[in-house]
């Protein structure tokens, strides 16, 4: 939850309107009004160098895990304090795992005040 709160705060500072999906099984955590379209965002956090990107589901006694698919979300926001990584789906090198060292160019320093005023432009199908 801490990662989600950090992302919400950052998006608020960038003046992005946002909503949380009513369906807890949705493949994204936030719906954000981007520059031209609504953008879906998946939020993760980790203290590991690499972690598996999986959707978790199931009931009280069982857990199921599924790999994310194209169309599940537009951007992946990954928190590893004091950094946040903002990666468009099309720029993910693998849909099943995330390795921080592979995404240094997508890293933003949460201890740098410029991070909160230099808005990242969120667009569908963003090309780098």
Model feature map: region roles:
Residues 1-26, 31-128:
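Mixed-charge (Asp/Glu-Lys/Arg
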């Amino acid at each position: 939850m801490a990662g989600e709160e950090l992302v919400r705060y950052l998006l608020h500072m960038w003046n992005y309107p946002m909503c949380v999906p009513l369906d807890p099984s949705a493949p994204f955590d936030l719906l954000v009004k981007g520059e031209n379209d609504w953008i879906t965002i998946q939020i993760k956090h980790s203290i590991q160098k690499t972690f598996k990107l999986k959707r978790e589901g199931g009931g009280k006694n069982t857990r199921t895990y599924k790999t994310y698919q194209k169309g599940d979300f537009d951007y992946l926001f990954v928190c590893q304090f004091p950094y946040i990584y903002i990666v468009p789906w099309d720029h993910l090198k693998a849909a099943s795992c995330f390795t921080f060292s592979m995404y240094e160019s997508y890293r933003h320093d949460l201890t740098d005040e410029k991070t909160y005023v230099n808005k990242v432009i969120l667009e569908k199908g963003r090309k780098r």
